[in-house]
């Protein structure tokens, strides 16, 4: 046995020596050959993966060698003997091969026996804790289209916020239950620098897995920049790929296939016939119901099982074209309540009067009664009668359908410019001329625009300096003891600024005054012009009135009564020299008329002025000439009560305003030119636009009427905005403004643009409502007048004051 064991040990030793010699020979050959550049075609892994794979293979081989050694120790003697016999045979073969081997073999002969091992299975095997095999697969390299939404997160805290770990050194746990420690934070200075100079890819968010700031990678930043520049995000996509013309743009002449149509396309289909017959049988048997019949069945079922919804919304049906619905009954009022307020209950006297009234004349068919509870209310006894009368009304009374006009109210309002764009115009009261003891009925402004004259019921005429409000002149023209009923009705400056004549209408007299406020030259010119008329009779001239206006406009009466025309007429007014007492009051001349003079207006040249006496009949309108001391009555008879009269601004025309009409007369041709129909009940005053083609009129029935003389005789605009009678209307001589004053104590200022284009209508824009005068005894603003040049307005009121309104 010992010998046997020695043999086996020697055999093993020899085998080890042979293995070591072979390994040395292989190493030398590897050094000489250096086959590092040979790569297996099937191996596609990286160098690191190959190293890991080789280490794993070596571990596996070593483990298998150990297992083989353990098993060989336990083999039986027979197996050992068999192995020894095989080893001896191998040694003999090796000895024979080595003995006859030739050292001069070529390199190619040596490489021909070399075999390269290829990796077929890319998986790496390891052991689990229980000893079973564990496959470690290589890491997956994700491509662009891959999705990592289901990837496992490193931090497994779930929905717990990171703020729960603020006081702990860790931020969560991984999948193995180990703590994930909080990353180290820099100093306060580092944090400040990081907040000032933001790092590249900064988002301001925290990474839940690591607890550090979550920054964008270069690839993500590049992707965002490409999206901002509207560029292609995937480089693998070519936006300019060559066009594949699926359908040729050239029209082919010959067909692609010229196969003739088969016969089955012209023969009725048997399959379709079977399907149609199947449907027909189903309809006959009632298994298929046509839509029309099904609809009728549903309607019939609906009518049979109809249940009225008492609380449902009422559905309106479309009426016939000729059908008119009955008007709805008015809803009940408070007096029809079972518990009405006390003021709705009738007193015994009212109840007795209601019972004595005829049924058809009663305002209501019942007497309001009060009950403590609704259950105590009896039945209404007049219900049958009311229903019967309503049926009679619906049956006998005709009804007409009135179509409602769907008009937008805003479309009816004209588009007017803003008042801010139409300045200047008066907006405030700057001066109050106080001093009169009675109502200031009239006022007038000097042509130079420096002096304001006012006339009051206290019998005085005062002249004020406009800018300072100082009274510079005063004269008393009415003696209350002699003429208690007279008033200063009208006052008007001469339009010629070189004479300073002031005409004042006091009762039946007209005084021409030259106030001593202008200086010697102007005062002398005015007095000289008045005194020149006294010498008119001295030179033998005859006072004739050759002005007679034919109101009918006919030429038939021109040849009649020529002698009567040339004859001397009876004087309608008398020019009197002033007395010594009147000279002390600066009165230069007095014109005595028959009746009270209400209105006075100068001609633009300053030689003529017209007066109105409403109660004087056919001599209501008189035209006076200062240079000749001549008074003429242009009309044979009066048509209505004359309220006002004015000259045209530049034409020889006279505007005469009666209570209801405005007539325009041509003084040169002595005919009636036009008759205006304002439509008001009682006109009070008129004024003509400086251009002469428009006229405004005021009325006591609270209206202001604008007439365009180039259009119809009816008003172009009728303005109703005053609450009481309108006393005065005036145009500005230079600016596109006009005003209206009324007894409600207000003055309305308007912008009025008159265009040169005859196709354009005047534009009227309300600007300002001026309030300041007090209403006394239902009298407010009695007169108003504009400054000759500035946008200033003067007003006279019943509160004994005159006011200046400026911008």
Swiss-Prot record:
Annotated signal sequence range: none
Cellular component GO terms, alphabetical: nucleoplasm; PeBoW complex; preribosome, large subunit precursor
InterPro entries given in the database record: BOP1/Erb1, BOP1_N_dom, WD40/YVTN_repeat-like_dom_sf, WD40_repeat_CS, WD40_repeat_dom_sf, WD40_rpt
UniProt entry keywords in alphabetical sequence: Isopeptide bond, Nucleus, Phosphoprotein, Repeat, Ribosome biogenesis, rRNA processing, Ubl conjugation, WD repeat
Biased composition (Basic and acidic residues): 57-69
Listed Acidic residues bias regions: 21-30, 42-56, 86-102
Modified residues (Phosphoserine): 23, 72, 76, 146, 149, 418
Start and end residues of each stretch annotated as Disordered: 1-112
Pfam families, A to Z: BOP1NT (PF08145), WD40 (PF00400)
Entry's Gene Ontology molecular function annotations: ribonucleoprotein complex binding
Cross-link position per record: Glycyl lysine isopeptide (Lys-Gly) (interchain with G-Cter in ubiquitin): 127
Main localization category: nucleus
SMART domains associated with the record: BOP1NT (SM01035), WD40 (SM00320)
Localization of this protein: Nucleus, Nucleolus; Nucleus, Nucleoplasm
PROSITE patterns referenced in this protein's UniProt entry, alphabetically: WD_REPEATS_1 (PS00678), WD_REPEATS_2 (PS50082), WD_REPEATS_REGION (PS50294)
Region listing for Required for interaction with NOP7, in residue ranges: 265-383
WD repeats: 435-474, 483-523, 592-634, 637-675, 678-717, 721-760, 776-807
GO biological process: maturation of 5.8S rRNA from tricistronic rRNA transcript (SSU-rRNA, 5.8S rRNA, LSU-rRNA); maturation of LSU-rRNA from tricistronic rRNA transcript (SSU-rRNA, 5.8S rRNA, LSU-rRNA)
UniProt-annotated stretches for the region Required for interaction with YTM1: 383-419
Family: Belongs to the WD repeat BOP1/ERB1 family.
Function: Component of the NOP7 complex, which is required for maturation of the 25S and 5.8S ribosomal RNAs and formation of the 60S ribosome.
Subunit (UniProt): Component of the NOP7 complex, composed of ERB1, NOP7 and YTM1. The complex is held together by ERB1, which interacts with NOP7 via its N-terminal domain and with YTM1 via a high-affinity interaction between the seven-bladed beta-propeller domains of the 2 proteins. The NOP7 complex associates with the 66S pre-ribosome.
Protein name: Ribosome biogenesis protein ERB1
Annotated source species: Saccharomyces cerevisiae (strain YJM789) (Baker's yeast)
